[in-house]
Curated annotation (Swiss-Prot):
It comes from Listeria innocua serovar 6a (strain ATCC BAA-680 / CLIP 11262). This is tRNA (guanine-N(1)-)-methyltransferase. GO terms for cellular component: cytosol. It holds the Pfam family tRNA_m1G_MT. It catalyses: guanosine(37) in tRNA + S-adenosyl-L-methionine = N(1)-methylguanosine(37) in tRNA + S-adenosyl-L-homocysteine + H(+). One of its GO terms (biological process) is tRNA N1-guanine methylation. Specifically methylates guanosine-37 in various tRNAs. Keywords: Cytoplasm, Methyltransferase, S-adenosyl-L-methionine, Transferase, tRNA processing.
């Protein structure tokens, strides 16, 4: 996969691309990440990327020209692919695991990271394929949001995680929150690991994990259960918890 990031603050990405899983993914050629300062594509001596909005109003808007030209430049470097051009924007579709899995199937992603009051609307209408938000709050720019999406996508690529099952069993990947985890020692200052995890009975352990995953979802994110295909056993567990309230 190729990921291009367009930002007027490219140095923000050096820590993300130079450490942990993303660094290893780049070194192992599972993904290539290139960060471009789209100010370099702004016309004029001063390379201005923002301007006042027509009709007045607070703040400045990112101009269409530098971003259009920067996107075209990264497309020209990889003409054999048709990239998803992703605009990081609080008005976009809420990012979730399903979207991460969808993006992970692509060959080329281009992230546009904005600043100031917003974007010239022609960028939305004629350039981007996806508008993505990471939540109902406002950040200084789109860079942190792009880092979150990029991290979530890269870890899903084949060969990136040491254990291929890790991404599959994470919270949200199955539609439910992940079950609790424990490691050694079995007794830490009187706080003990559930006996069933020490039993060696894999069938019991899997059922315990399934039940705890459902319980955690029921208690913390009941909205996720609205369209979840519950088994008869899971329905019984939910009824037990509901009746005990």
């Amino acid at each position: 996969m190729k990921i291009d990031i367009l930002s007027i603050f490219p140095d923000m990405f050096s820590g993300v691309t130079g450490s942990s899983i993303i660094k290893k993914a780049i070194e192992n050629e599972r993904v290539a990440v290139e960060v471009t300062d789209f100010r370099e594509y702004a016309e004029g001596k001063h390379q201005v990327v923002d301007d006042y909005p027509y009709g007045g109003g607070a703040g400045m808007l990112l101009k269409a020209q530098p971003i259009f030209d920067a996107v075209q430049a990264v497309k020209d470097k990889q003409p054999e692919t048709k990239p998803r051009v992703i605009l990081m924007d609080p008005a976009g579709k809420r990012f979730d695991q399903k979207m991460a899995e969808e993006f992970a199937e692509e060959e080329h992603l281009v992230f546009i990271c904005g600043h100031y009051e917003g974007y010239d609307e022609r960028i939305r209408e004629h350039l981007v394929t996806d508008e993505v938000s990471i939540g109902d709050y406002i950040l200084t720019g789109g860079e942190i949001g792009a880092m979150i999406v990029m991290d979530s996508v890269i870890r899903l690529l084949p060969g990136v995680l040491g254990n291929k099952d890790s991404a599959v069993t994470d919270s949200f990947s199955t539609g439910l929150l992940e079950h609790p985890h424990y490691t050694r020692p079995a007794d830490f200052r009187g706080m003990k690991v559930p006996d069933i995890l020490l039993s060696g009975n894999h069938a019991w352990i899997e059922e315990w994990r399934d039940k705890e995953s459902l319980k955690r979802t029921y208690e913390r994110r009941p909205d996720l259960l609205k369209n979840y295909p519950l088994t008869d056993k899971q329905k019984t567990w939910l009824k037990e918890w509901s009746d005990s309230k």
